[in-house]
């Protein structure tokens, strides 16, 4: 179970890094927001879901 938590945290860190780099690039590029809006919202939704799943799995271990 500890390995599952570690993998979830690794995925959370990786997705956070992608969003921290990707969102400002999309917002700074002219015209990219309209093309990438759905992708950014999907990434934010995945990040939120991953935080919730990680917290639920962590609560089962403790």
Swiss-Prot record:
Q: Which residues cross the membrane?
A: 8-28, 41-61
Q: Which UniProt keywords apply?
A: Chloroplast, Membrane, Photosynthesis, Photosystem II, Plastid, Reaction center, Thylakoid, Transmembrane, Transmembrane helix
Q: Which domain of life is it from?
A: Eukaryota
Return one Gene Ontology term, BP aspect. Answer: photosystem II stabilization
Regarding the membrane, this protein is recorded as: Multi-pass membrane protein
Q: Name one GO cellular component term.
A: photosystem II reaction center
Which cellular compartments is it found in?
Answer: Plastid, Chloroplast thylakoid membrane
Pfam families listed in its UniProt record: Ycf9
Main location as per UniProt:
plastid
Q: Which InterPro entries match?
A: PSII_PsbZ, PSII_PsbZ_sf
On whether Signal is a keyword of this UniProt record, the answer is no
**What does this chain do?**
May control the interaction of photosystem II (PSII) cores with the light-harvesting antenna, regulates electron flow through the 2 photosystem reaction centers. PSII is a light-driven water plastoquinone oxidoreductase, using light energy to abstract electrons from H(2)O, generating a proton gradient subsequently used for ATP formation.
What NCBIfam families does this protein map onto?
PS_II_psbZ (TIGR03043)
Q: Which family does it belong to?
A: Belongs to the PsbZ family.
Instruction: Describe its partners and assembly state.
Output: PSII is composed of 1 copy each of membrane proteins PsbA, PsbB, PsbC, PsbD, PsbE, PsbF, PsbH, PsbI, PsbJ, PsbK, PsbL, PsbM, PsbT, PsbX, PsbY, PsbZ, Psb30/Ycf12, at least 3 peripheral proteins of the oxygen-evolving complex and a large number of cofactors. It forms dimeric complexes.
Can you say what this protein is called? Photosystem II reaction center protein Z
Q: Which organism is it from?
A: Pyropia yezoensis (Susabi-nori)
Q: Supply the gene name.
A: psbZ
């Amino acid at each position: 179970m500890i390995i599952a938590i570690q993998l979830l945290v690794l995925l959370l860190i990786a997705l956070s890094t992608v969003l921290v780099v990707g969102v400002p690039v999309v917002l700074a590029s002219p015209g990219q927001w309209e093309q990438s809006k759905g992708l950014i919202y999907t990434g934010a939704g995945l990040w939120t879901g991953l935080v919730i799943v990680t917290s639920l799995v962590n609560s089962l271990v403790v």
